[in-house]
Amino acid sequence: MIKAVCPGSFDPVTLGHLDIIERAARTFDEVVVAVLTNPRKEPLFTVEERLEMLREATKHIPNVSVAAADGLLVDFARQQGCRVIVKGLRPIQDFEYEWQMGAVNRQLDGNIETCFLMSRIEYAHLSSSIVRELAYFGRPTEGLVPPFTARRLREKFAKTQP
């Protein structure tokens, strides 16, 4: 049995994230979606809110679980019994950083592999940052994020609209 971790900040989860998670779930026996915190960023949603959105978005995938992760990803992967880290790659912008992180993780634990899944062309332009900006200005996010997440974005930004 091969268990994988699919990490991210998921602030918020997008359809691009969900596509990578679904493809990982078809490839590996079990997938843990890890919600990471980045101390250099101020998130829009709390960890609990992001966990809730991910649980809702992945409830149709039986071999996927969702968990919060602090510290180094490779340590979390080891603690969870994951042998693979799954990362989605968008054209150009993600490769260098993700390759460096994969190399560092391999150096920290040679038993954990990094697997890159290329984003589908329809999601190559998509990022949580773009979704947050659209939502902030009151633009629809349907078709970019799961329906539950779109509702949460509308609720979050309803207070900021004139």
Curated annotation (Swiss-Prot):
GO cellular component, one term: cytoplasm
Cofactor: Mg(2+)
GO biological process: coenzyme A biosynthetic process
Domain of life from the UniProt record: Bacteria
PANTHER family the UniProt entry points to: PHOSPHOPANTETHEINE ADENYLYLTRANSFERASE (PTHR21342:SF1)
Quaternary data: Homohexamer.
Listed name of the protein: Phosphopantetheine adenylyltransferase
